[in-house]
Amino acid sequence: MNATPKQKKLISLSQFILEEQLKIPHASGEFSALLSHLVYAAKIVGREVRKAGLLDDILGATEDTNVQGETQMKLDQYADNAFNQSLKICGHLCVLASEEHEDIIPIPGGYNIGKYTMAIDPLDGSSNIDTNVSIGTIFSIHQRLEPNSKEPGNERDLLQKGHLQRCAGYIIYGSSTMLVLSTGKGVSGFTLDPSVGEFLLSHPNMQMPESGDIYSANEGNASYWSPEVQAYLQKIKSIEGGKKPKTARYIGSLVADFHRNLLKGGIFLYPNDTKSSKYPNGKLRLLYEAAPMAFIAEQAGGMAVTVKGERILDLTPKDLHERTTLIIGSKKEVEEFLTFVAK
């Protein structure tokens, strides 16, 4: 007689956070409450993303540009507003920063000042919205420099090294909506069950494969890359000696490309180039793109460095929108890249 298969225990994000909180002596619950406000906004954004093809007022571009000089998509503005409104009045932040705002977003008067900071890219990969490609939200949480202060936070509270992050993660809006996060004790993935409106633990203890066969890069710019990066690219594509070349997979959405490589193994490259003098140090933002993704990568056993070989998590941002190069992925793949930088 066949035994009845053991039913998988479903753990909600709320339960997971509570259980983790109980492991910390004298935990106040402030951090858990902050995450609940983040998740609430993510559910709202995810709902609108799923309906994007049906609503004329969500798809397409606006006439506005953000601080980066990029044309804002309608869903960009919607996502920014959803996270902004949910987070700045939650009572657990002292200051907030967003890709869509040039300056810090202060906590409005009359609301509690918390001990955490958050930097967020409300909608990464938004240029892909109209083509139904996976997009995402990236966030980074630090504890403020003076955790007992009840004064509003400032830019200094945000400009901390990546390895000091208390939590980092991303939400990917794809065939399902998934939240991947780390509080410095490994990486966990939660998938949204729309029938109950809860994120459920679907990927416990996520580990990036030590090596992988995938590389992700915009090779259309390869001629503008440094000789070292070009040499590395030729090496991984080479069939010399009967070697199997790596497979190219590039979506053009950092969250989507990274998420695939986190699960399957591989390397993502976004070097600087000579195509334009606008981004001499790279294009990705250190504070709310590179640093949180690097935190996730390292917690999952991977690596993240600049094109010069600097560890991303050791860099101190000089301003909110500082840009950087990013080489991130499986440990052995990044280590191989570093051998070309060292030459």
UniProtKB/Swiss-Prot annotation:
Compartment(s) of residence: Cytoplasm
Binding-site residues for Mg(2+) 1, renumbered to this chain: 99, 121, 123
MF terms in GO: fructose 1,6-bisphosphate 1-phosphatase activity; magnesium ion binding
Higher taxonomy: Bacteria, Pseudomonadati, Spirochaetota, Spirochaetia, Leptospirales
Family annotation (NCBIfam families): PRK09293.1-1 (NF006778)
Binding residues for Mg(2+) 2: 121, 124, 289
Binding positions (substrate): 124-127, 218, 250, 283
Single GO BP term: gluconeogenesis
Keyword terms: Carbohydrate metabolism, Cytoplasm, Hydrolase, Magnesium, Metal-binding
Co-factor binding details: Binds 2 magnesium ions per subunit.
Cofactor: Mg(2+)
Subunit structure: Homotetramer.
Species annotation: Leptospira biflexa serovar Patoc (strain Patoc 1 / ATCC 23582 / Paris)
Catalytic activity, reaction form: beta-D-fructose 1,6-bisphosphate + H2O = beta-D-fructose 6-phosphate + phosphate
Pathway(s) the chain acts in: Carbohydrate biosynthesis; gluconeogenesis
CDD domains the record matches: FBPase (cd00354)
InterPro entries named in the record: FBPase_C_dom, FBPase_class-1, FBPase_N, FBPtase, Fructose_bisphosphatase_AS
Main location: cytoplasm
Full protein name: Fructose-1,6-bisphosphatase class 1
Protein family: Belongs to the FBPase class 1 family.
Cellular component aspect of the GO annotation: cytosol
EC numbers, comma separated: 3.1.3.11
